[in-house]
Amino acid sequence: MKFFALFIYRPVATILLSVAITLCGILGFRMLPVAPLPQVDFPVIMVSASLPGASPETMASSVATPLERSLGRIAGVSEMTSSSSLGSTRIILQFDFDRDINGAARDVQAAINAAQSLLPSGMPSRPTYRKANPSDAPIMILTLTSDTYSQGELYDFASTQLAPTISQIDGVGDVDVGGSSLPAVRVGLNPQALFNQGVSLDDVRTAISNANVRKPQGALEDGTHRWQIQTNDELKTAAEYQPLIIHYNNGGAVRLGDVATVTDSVQDVRNAGMTNAKPAILLMIRKLPEANIIQTVDSIRAKLPELQETIPAAIDLQIAQDRSPTIRASLEEVEQTLIISVALVILVVFLFLRSGRATIIPAVAVPVSLIGTFAAMYLCGFSLNNLSLMALTIATGFVVDDAIVVLENIARHLEAGMKPLQAALQGTREVGFTVLSMSLSLVAVFLPLLLMGGLPGRLLREFAVTLSVAIVISLLVSLTLTPMMCGWMLKASKPREQKRLRGFGRMLVALQQGYGKSLKWVLNHTRLVGVVLLGTIALNIWLYISIPKTFFPEQDTGVLMGGIQADQSISFQAMRGKLQDFMKIIRDDPAVDNVTGFTGGSRVNSGMMFITLKPRDERSETAQQIIDRLRVKLAKEPGANLFLMAVQDIRVGGRQSNASYQYTLLSDDLAALREWEPKIRKKLATLPELADVNSDQQDNGAEMNLVYDRDTMARLGIDVQAANSLLNNAFGQRQISTIYQPMNQYKVVMEVDPRYTQDISALEKMFVINNEGKAIPLSYFAKWQPANAPLSVNHQGLSAASTISFNLPTGKSLSDASAAIDRAMTQLGVPSTVRGSFAGTAQVFQETMNSQVILIIAAIATVYIVLGILYESYVHPLTILSTLPSAGVGALLALELFNAPFSLIALIGIMLLIGIVKKNAIMMVDFALEAQRHGNLTPQEAIFQACLLRFRPIMMTTLAALFGALPLVLSGGDGSELRQPLGITIVGGLVMSQLLTLYTTPVVYLFFDRLRLRFSRKPKQTVTE
């Protein structure tokens, strides 16, 4: 009593306290960062190593395995995967959430150093690492195009000037430059001309290397001067290499231009990048795992004018893709939904109270509670994201509940003629414990979420804390500001209501009277109600088992990512054509705004595409519908597949795959894995629950296998090293010399001119100079035949691995796909030597599925304990919790009706319903107990009176919560796929709960009261109407 009086009789202090809460919230709001979702990125580090010319199998055994053994000893590594292709190895380390990325990076460097002695001596450089996840979609893609500069020159500007500067921006983890390679002088040799002149490829290589050197020459001094010695020992352009003398034949000089075509070109001609229909260089920017995407993008944009000034005016620097606009639009949609929810909730209060003065009170209490929450969010290091703003949207219905309960009870006393200040004090005292019980039990629902580990726990923690803080502030406001405003603003007389609102008042009275009559009938047919209650419990179990489930709703971020997978023996020229064909098909779609793509590098048969869709208000289809439409058109392209998926804000794991979900096959027997992977992949491709099934196992690449006749080689005076050197010189794009420039270093690349290597007959033109100086054709001592060879070798841990990726067809859920895969594996009879398990997001889904029921049970148990402590009773908490089954049925039926799978967002809705619907029972039970203790009423009379007395606040609080969630259901635009499942769950649960709990709660109350009397051996009371 004294606590409430302190605030009611000191209005100035109470107002200033509320102003202080509001000001702190405004300051917190201004300092909060903006993000699509809470920070849930796993710390990921990528280790790269290269050994030019080495086969994938050689890279896997000699480079990947030693590094894996050393890196695998690092503490906190949750997953280690590697992929080895021609000349390169990439190892992805995913760490536990609580592992500091900088500390992990130091451990990675130490592990690389420890493995250095086990690595091949021919590696051109030590392995390097980057603190970025290569499987993440870029947060921004910049393109460089020009009608004046070549692709190599553009690449030079990008890699030398732009990429280093952008990498230094806070939040940037990696800048990957694609579409070409650095400028180089390329020497394309003519095999026939070399043969005619008696010059070997090694002779050419040695001559070029000796002609381009950079060594210190020293200095000259006399008594007073010093001269630095400088020579023309470096050749920098193709024109300078053209007249280079490489050999003398019969006294005549053989110049490089006589046996080769020398051009200013690029290091690797097997690279191509495009934006829309124009050749381009791509800068793909990824953020650090812990970085904020909006802040990072804003920092990059602020730097762009300065970057533009560092490159020539003839180069066009454009933003081809930016992830931030859809994120900002999504948050704006949530903010609008929040405002609409507040307005609707206040409208509900006005309709029920039919008083402008009374409506002002919750209209003040709600903003104070919500705005004050921002201060706590800032102190907790949270951000303004879809989940935290949804928490505040839902909180509008909660925070007004407390004010409604207090306000309605005070208004009831005023209508009975009590003076305002006395009514405020008395009314608050009567419901103070009720409000405390409702708020604390609601906060208790989220305690299990705070203790939940892994990605789901990290994802839901911000939502739970934000909502809990809003409820606690609301509790404080409802017991201080609300009664003070009631005492000083409301009048003792019955409020005059407008004529147009009288109809609503009469309707409410009629509803209350009808409810009273129906409740009397129900209390005389309690067994029927008990059967209904048991039926809802059984229906809950059946619906939960049968409803489709997924991890997280599929988002429409306005960005698609595509992976091209072509025939494993495809040439680069053909692959570049496939890239152009696919880009044209996508560019012609009316929903597409921009397309960028690239191909080449160590995997010639693959490529990547990034598609920016038009804003949501300019297209009628969702991202998934656009993918479905494009899939039909893309399937007509022969010899290659383009797999599209919508970029998501949550992507787990470091595997680069062509689809959203992964299923990994592991084996210590590589032959068994290669035997069973095609069988499993083909089986999964037939399943209607899966789409875009593909695999990263590529072991059918075309290979030309040369077999040396060592006896013949010995007789001809040729060794294996000379033969291998010949092949490397001819076909390996061998970097034979370095050109030093002030800003960068460039290579001289030697190979047989591509004009002479268009078919296998090119091998017949190759020759080796033996130890007697004679030219010996390769065909004299070697035979060759085509064979198959892997294009890549993949590991997980230290086991051979193959990852099958898949998307979900429209109308199918991840639980459908998971069950179908499990059935297929059983039907195939896969041996125990090949192990299958879900990976990435699918793995987290499996783990979440196993913990969902436990989480719900834990939440219910926590609420029971809190209520038991508050009521000092084992029985009354059970009465209150009996409201939950009907809410669960309503929520699950609503999800089924809207064809929405049960996701992590829907789970949040279920947890919220546990907190919401029990409020009705708390109000009933509190007043029933009070009537029994002080009114000398029987249990049936007490609960009947409590139900009628609390009918109006129950309807008000339920409708406030329902109208607070309704905008989430009806909202469209960016991010609606996240908001709608939450709104559907809450609205469905509230509607069903409101229909049933008004009747089931009184029946359960009487049942437990009889049970209590029976066990306490007290005389059974007679129930009367």
UniProtKB/Swiss-Prot annotation:
Q: List the disulfide bonds.
A: none
Quote the Pfam families the UniProt record gives.
Answer: ACR_tran
Record's Gene Ontology CC terms? plasma membrane
Protein induction: The mdtABC operon is transcriptionally activated by BaeR.
Annotated GO MF terms: xenobiotic transmembrane transporter activity
The protein's matches in InterPro entries, at most eight in alphabetical order, are given as: AcrB_DN_DC_subdom, Acrflvin-R, Multidrug-R_MdtC
Q: Where are the transmembrane segments?
A: 3-23, 333-353, 360-380, 387-407, 431-451, 463-483, 528-548, 853-873, 875-895, 897-917, 953-973, 984-1004
NCBIfam families cross-referenced by the UniProt entry: PRK10614.1, RND_permease_2
The family line of this record is: Belongs to the resistance-nodulation-cell division (RND) (TC 2.A.6) family. MdtC subfamily.
Protein name from the UniProt record: Multidrug resistance protein MdtC
Organism of derivation: Escherichia coli O139:H28 (strain E24377A / ETEC)
Gene name as annotated: mdtC
